[in-house]
Amino acid sequence: MKKLIVIVLLAVVGGGLIVDSGYIYAKAELAQEFIEDAWQETLEKAKAGIEDKVKPWSWADTWPVARMQMAKHDIDLYVLNGTTGNALAFGPGYMNGSSQPGYPGAMVIGGHRDTHFSFLKDVKIGEQFSMQTKTGEVFNYRIISMDIVDVTRDKLVVDGFDDSLVKLVTCYPFDAVNPGGPQRYVVTAGLGL
């Protein structure tokens, strides 16, 4: 009888761990459908001359501000406003105050290394991706550098650039056991280079 109780308890705990570990992945993927709908509505409103923050669901504290596509890695992501934990659970996030596609300066986009930005470990210098703005305009960027930055010592530079850059930022190393360490992997891309 004790053996049966131990087996049942282990099965319940194991099942709970499996469900819990899959939760963030499922949430991130399912939310993409709602976010895609919000993005389409954002584009339609922009065509009509209406600037609006179209939230993917009524209680959302974020909304799509750009679309990033990278065919080589089969990437099609909607960039959300803000880099809070809530926003990053659903997609990569735009760092408020950084630049916009097509404008001088650096647009900074953060994402989790184990979900939306897991592909960054496979990108190479020279690869291209596109950024679509909420007005529908598309800008093509080429990767020019990949760096590892220690946030306890170094500051991510976003100002003072004459060129239009996009900086994709995620935690590093990609296979770290503990999340949120001090290192960041920064992929920098330049407009049309």
Language-model features and meaning:
Residues 4-193:
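Solvent-exposed, non-transmembrane regions of membrane-associated and secreted proteins
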